[in-house]
């Protein structure tokens, strides 16, 4: 069944959305396995009420192959879809990180002096969810990106009944300061819901919790892959064992409004890219980062 979703096409500077325009699109997401295989998806017929497609994690090598006659194409994002091969074993994976990364992670873990709590059953997730949900409400992921932990505890418990979710909390002095909640897609665990208390940002609680979660996953042996999903970031790049060059490709019906929208997005994104280059030349990255996050 083809699902049509309202998609907000955002005019963004860093994590800050300045404006957005909505289009009803058929979303075609590729899994990590499909991206790694270099797959080119077969698009479903476009319903009359839909204005186009949004294909996510399309291997960059398939970008031109997916062109559809008469449709307007626009790349919304280019990134590496990072992942970790969990068959490597913890020691081999950790040895594959840069020396600076290894030393930094060890130092952060010692400095933060916190406990890791682990959750996988339906009963355990009933304890995890309210604590993580309260923490999520304070994170920039939820406040600025709308990417917080969902309210749906029942959904998490259904996943737990199928042994298809893992979750962790980092707790310091009885207070949850970071959470990680990862549903599974077959043998792949997804980096889906993550956040930390802004008051502890200087201690890198998310990185510390991620390291301990990976230690658990390597030891458990239940999953073959850890998927950092769409988009990039220093944290993902630092910990990944590999990645696939991907694009998010939007295909729209060739209406006048859609032509104007694509031109506006291209012009705005080009201006942001130019501004970033100027900021780098001036050495003002720190100031720009604070402005983007507000």
Predicted regions and their residues:
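A conserved beta-strand-loop-helix scaffold within acyl/acetyltransferase catalytic domains
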Residues: 1-21, 58-84, 88-202
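Active-site/acyl-donor-binding loops of N-acyltransferases
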Residues: 2-18, 22-24, 70-91, 224-283, ...
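Acyl-donor binding region in acyl/amide transferases
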Residues: 12-74, 186-244, 251
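Generic preference for flexible, low-structure residues
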Residues: 66-71, 98-100, 132, 148, ...
């Amino acid at each position: 069944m083809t699902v049509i979703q309202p998609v907000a096409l955002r005019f963004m500077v860093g994590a800050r959305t300045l404006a957005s325009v909505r289009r009803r699109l058929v979303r075609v997401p590729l899994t990590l396995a499909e991206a790694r295989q270099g797959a080119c998806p077969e698009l479903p017929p476009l319903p009359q009420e839909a204005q186009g497609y949004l294909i996510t994690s399309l291997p960059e090598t398939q970008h031109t192959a997916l062109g559809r006659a008469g449709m307007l194409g626009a790349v919304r994002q280019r990134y590496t879809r990072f992942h970790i091969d969990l068959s490597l074993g913890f020691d081999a994976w950790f040895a594959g990180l840069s020396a600076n990364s290894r030393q930094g992670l060890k130092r952060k873990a010692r400095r933060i002096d916190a406990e890791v709590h682990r959750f996988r059953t339906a009963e355990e997730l009933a304890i995890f969810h309210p604590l993580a949900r309260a923490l999520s409400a304070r994170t920039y992921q939820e406040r600025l990106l709308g990417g917080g932990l969902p309210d749906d505890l029942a959904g998490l418990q259904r996943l737990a009944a199928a042994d298809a979710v893992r979750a962790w909390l980092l707790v310091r002095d009885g207070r949850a300061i970071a959470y990680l909640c990862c549903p599974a897609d077959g043998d792949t665990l997804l980096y889906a819901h993550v956040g930390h208390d802004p008051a502890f940002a200087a201690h890198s609680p998310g990185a510390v919790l991620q390291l301990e979660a990976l230690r658990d996953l390597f030891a458990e042996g239940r999953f073959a892959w850890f998927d950092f999903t769409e988009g990039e970031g220093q944290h993902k790049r630092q910990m990944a064992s590999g990645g696939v060059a991907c694009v998010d490709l939007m295909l729209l019906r060739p209406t006048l409004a859609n032509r104007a929208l694509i031109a506006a997005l291209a012009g705005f994104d080009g201006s942001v890219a130019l501004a970033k280059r100027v900021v780098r030349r001036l050495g003002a990255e720190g100031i720009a980062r604070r402005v983007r996050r507000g």
